[in-house]
């Protein structure tokens, strides 16, 4: 992993003991950016993060001043999750995580909730293009999803 951006360190997740901190980051980020998410879906997803979602991906953690502040989860060529604590949003942490997983894990795909305009713009500005749309998300919930791939013309 790499160090850069001052005191930002990108590293592999240290295992299950770190999951509670990652759930806190997820909660902060989702509350700030996913106002379209139904409360019961929020609770259900949150309850499955440590048991189902985190173990299914390779997690990269962004740490600032010794504290986790963001993370990315990758499966194959797909970025399955990227969340940054709302307290440090806009400081380049998401960009650093995305650059790391593209360069070192071969990420070339991401799915984005259609209602999450900020995330869509983030990925477009970093070279991703929309290649498809699904009416339901991966868990068959009524959250339309945009399928994006890294453009070869970056």
Describe the residue ranges of each PLM region.
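A short beta-loop-alpha structural element at the N-terminal edge
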Residues: 8-24
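Conserved beta-hairpin
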Residues: 58-70
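A short, internal acetyl-CoA/4′-phosphopantetheine-binding micro-motif in the GNAT/acyltransferase core
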Residues: 78-89, 112-113
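Conserved acetyl-CoA-binding loop of GNAT-fold acetyltransferases
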Residues: 124-133
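Conserved GNAT-fold acetyl-CoA-binding loop/helix
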Residues: 24-50
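A short helix-loop-beta-strand connector motif used in the catalytic cores of GNAT acetyltransferases and
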Residues: 50-61, 78
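Conserved GNAT acetyl-CoA-binding A-motif
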Residues: 103-115
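Conserved acetyl-CoA-binding loop-helix of GNAT-fold acetyltransferases
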Residues: 90-103, 120-121, 125
């Amino acid at each position: 992993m790499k160090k850069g951006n001052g005191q930002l360190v990108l590293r592999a997740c240290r295992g299950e003991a770190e999951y509670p901190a990652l759930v806190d980051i997820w909660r902060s980020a989702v509350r700030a950016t996913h106002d379209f998410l139904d409360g019961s879906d929020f609770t259900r997803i949150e309850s499955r993060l440590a048991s189902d979602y985190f173990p299914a991906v390779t997690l990269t953690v962004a740490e600032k001043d010794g504290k986790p502040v963001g993370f990315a989860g990758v499966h194959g060529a797909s970025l399955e999750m990227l969340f940054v604590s709302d307290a440090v949003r806009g400081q380049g942490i998401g960009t650093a995580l995305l650059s790391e997983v593209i360069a070192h894990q071969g990420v070339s795909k991401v799915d984005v909730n259609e209602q999450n305009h900020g995330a869509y713009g983030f990925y477009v500005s970093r070279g991703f293009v929309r290649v498809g749309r699904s009416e339901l998300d991966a868990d068959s919930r009524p959250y339309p999803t945009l399928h994006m791939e890294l453009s070869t013309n970056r």
